[in-house]
């Protein structure tokens, strides 16, 4: 009896200590500038550049793009439905210039839910089946004893479970079990660093399953995993306030905002401060990162797509006025040590040029080649000087001597005198 009283007292104390993660309102002009950066991307309607995350981010934000949103969703539907239905009916996929990945399809399902659409038609059922096939294929790649890895990533795996869940579609216990095992055994730590966005996506997926009481036989493990994810994210907070890095912070905050916990209040206020400084410095330029941050600034998460409010008032965005361009040159040195003979060359580009511009300039000068592949987060390197990234390898971008870049080649803008190394590393 005394033990029971002690446990009840302890649970009461912990309950009293639990806090919500609240992000106080930020300067409206900063938030508006963030939304304005998405507008040019909504004019890019080619199959390679369509990004469902842009639509989701805007719909969960406090801003809207008017008829542009409707046109963008229309083009998303044309692209995904035509490509997916063609790929399931035959091997002829010639009408689609890019292959639809599981993560991309999952984001498209989130976009439909952001428009208050629930999958129920024959086309919708085929898309659900396609995403479930993707998860089954990834489950097989992971292996019965978890000795393997997903063909894509655990991030896409968790995102796919989340997308099906917000559409009220169940997945098999064995599929959820793989993600649970990965969280329980620290599979999202690479080279000593936690992949915060992967951890957060898994946490969002588990929280959705818990709210619907899906996979009830796994309920105790799901509840424990949610707590584990929260604790890992909080431990990954840097002294500056961000979780992991500044670009993984939006998803981390989405996860932390879903339920109360001990110590969340101060941690989230600290994260807000780091985000504010980054926004003032213009750090968020990539549409994928912006679209993950906008919901947070509107006190929403992907879990709001369970019951979206499509009638909520949103402020109309207007295009930003362009600042005058002052042309000056900077010198950037490119270094590649992962090939023989090693490569090193200094090139000149206009100030404000991206790393991709630097690579193009080096290629134009001769003796340098590289290949890329498009993704929703922007192009990434697949080969440098003829050397292809192999299985479980990737080309890492570093600022010499040894600082990994947090942005991709299309987003990072080297400063004058910097040396950028392209290094082939194993995952």
Swiss-Prot record:
Keywords: Cobalt, Cobalt transport, Disulfide bond, Ion transport, Metal-binding, Secreted, Signal, Transport. GO terms for molecular function: cargo receptor ligand activity; cobalamin binding; metal ion binding. Residues 1-18 form the signal peptide. InterPro entries: Cbl-bd_prot, Cobalamin_Transport, Transcobalamin-like_C. GO terms for cellular component: external side of plasma membrane; extracellular space. Disulfide bonds join 21-268, 116-310, 165-208. Primary vitamin B12-binding and transport protein. Delivers cobalamin to cells. Interacts with CD320 (via LDL-receptor class A domains). Belongs to the eukaryotic cobalamin transport proteins family. This is Transcobalamin-2. It comes from Rattus norvegicus (Rat).
């Amino acid at each position: 009896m005394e033990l029971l009283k002690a446990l009840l007292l302890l649970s009461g104390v912990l309950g009293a200590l639990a806090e919500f993660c609240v992000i106080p309102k930020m300067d409206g002009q900063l938030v508006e500038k963030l939304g304005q950066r998405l507008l040019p991307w909504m004019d890019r309607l080619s199959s390679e550049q369509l990004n469902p995350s842009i639509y989701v981010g805007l719909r969960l934000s406090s801003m809207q793009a008017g008829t542009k949103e409707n046109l963008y969703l229309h083009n998303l539907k044309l692209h995904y439905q035509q490509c997916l239905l063609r790929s399931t009916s035959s091997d002829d996929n010639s009408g689609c210039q890019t292959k639809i990945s599981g993560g991309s399809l999952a984001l498209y399902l989130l976009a439909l839910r952001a428009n208050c659409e629930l999958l129920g038609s024959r086309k919708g059922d085929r898309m659900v089946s396609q995403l479930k096939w993707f998860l089954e294929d990834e489950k097989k790649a992971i292996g019965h004893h978890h000795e393997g890895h997903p063909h894509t990533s655990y991030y896409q795996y968790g995102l796919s479970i989340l997308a099906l869940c917000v559409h009220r579609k169940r997945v098999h216990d064995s599929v959820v079990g793989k993600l649970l095992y990965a969280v329980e055994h620290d599979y999202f730590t690479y080279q000593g660093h936690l992949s915060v966005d992967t951890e957060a996506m898994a946490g969002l997926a588990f929280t959705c399953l818990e709210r619907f009481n899906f996979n009830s036989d796994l309920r105790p493990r799901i509840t424990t995993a949610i707590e584990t994810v929260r604790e890992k994210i909080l431990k990954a907070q840097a002294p500056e306030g961000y979780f992991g890095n500044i670009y993984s912070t939006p998803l981390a905050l989405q996860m932390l905002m879903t339920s109360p916990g001990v110590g969340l209040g101060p941690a989230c206020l600290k994260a807000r401060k780091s985000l504010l400084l980054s926004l003032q410095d213009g750090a968020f330029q990539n549409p994928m990162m912006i679209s993950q941050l906008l919901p947070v600034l509107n006190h929403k998460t992907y879990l709001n797509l369970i019951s979206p409010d499509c009638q909520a008032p949103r402020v109309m965005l207007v295009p930003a006025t362009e600042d005058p361009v002052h042309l000056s040159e900077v010198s950037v040195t490119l270094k590649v040590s992962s090939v023989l003979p090693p490569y090193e060359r200094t090139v000149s580009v206009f100030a404000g040029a991206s790393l991709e511009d630097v690579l193009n300039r080096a290629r134009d000068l001769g003796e340098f080649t590289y290949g890329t592949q498009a993704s929703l987060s922007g192009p990434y390197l697949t080969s440098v000087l003829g050397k292809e990234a192999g299985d479980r390898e990737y080309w890492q971008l570093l600022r010499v001597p040894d600082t990994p870049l947090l942005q991709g080649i299309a987003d990072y803008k080297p400063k004058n005198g910097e040396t950028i190394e392209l290094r082939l590393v194993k995952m």
